[in-house]
Amino acid sequence: MGKVGWSDLHEDLIDLLANNLSSNINLLRFRSICKPWRSTVATKKRLHNHFERNLPTFKKKKTVVSPSTFFRVTLPSPCRNKGWLIKNRQVSESSKNNLLSPLSGKTITPSDKTLDLLKVECFRDSSILQLFADSDRVVFLDNVFFVVDFKNEIWCCKSGEETRHWTRINNEEAKGFLDIILHKGKIYALDLTGAIWWISLSELSIYQYGPSTPVDFYEIDNCKEKRLVEYCGELCVVHRFYKKFCVKRVLTERTVCFKVYKMDKNLVEWVEVSSLGDKALIVATDNCFLVLASEYYGCLENAIYFNDREDVSVFKLDDCSIITKQINSSSSSSHQSCFQMFSTSFF
């Protein structure tokens, strides 16, 4: 049997491949392979992961779910193995896109230059639940959206036009949920106690997957955020700790510490991760993921990058210190060079 060229693939196979793409950028890459693929795959009708639905929590307002993609941008230079981190959001079913800050999700002020997203490395897709604060926890699987809303409830809805019905996924033993993640083809959620739950797609039911992550009694009031992240192929839980400070006679909360936990399968208990090795953890508004530090300008190994109110900061696991990016400071200075990966100097 002879070899089949890319342009000779059957339309049904091309159709199947296109339906598994999760962002418009990936779809554009796919259509650019050859002319038959471009004519077979229509752009607009493929974007199933962008839709408007009235989430029960907001009965009178539309909930807009739109896909977003994280990119690693590199340019021809002596350091071609290093790049910058940027985020792209598809704001409509047309080709319109916004470039966002990877951590805060805020729109980056456009310049007179353009960035060809087909020539940069796409390494992670996610979705953003727009319009409502604290509702950025969204995953997409098998044409179904799963959302954690601001009331810590999980809802799911098919992305097709055949239904606009949201279904709540609930378990009486769980008091509420904080995060949700797609891991190895399955959906997992994190409850308020730091326990992981597994969602059955066939039953649309949820079952506890493991015990709660440990929090010392004196830390309970300060641990106000928990997130899920995949590390070394396993699910881990990230705890974020806050403390109140008086700044100019105003009481404000600031991040003071992070802890990362992984499951010890032999002991069947959570153990604290002492080092992330050569990786850095990115805690974004809608996603948590790890990157190889050596692939990004200034990126610190064994560190956690996060947004604290209006500030971009990094927490170093080796000495538990925090460096905050100074407003209007140059990321090229020695103290601020660890934030170069978020610079848009490539424009």
From Swiss-Prot:
<dbReference type="Pfam" id="PF03478">
    <property type="entry name" value="Beta-prop_KIB1-4"/>
</dbReference>
<protein>
    <recommendedName>
        <fullName>Probable F-box protein At1g44080</fullName>
    </recommendedName>
</protein>
<dbReference type="InterPro" id="IPR051304">
    <property type="entry name" value="SCF_F-box_domain"/>
</dbReference>
<feature type="domain" description="F-box">
    <location>
        <begin position="4"/>
        <end position="51"/>
    </location>
</feature>
<dbReference type="InterPro" id="IPR005174">
    <property type="entry name" value="KIB1-4_b-propeller"/>
</dbReference>
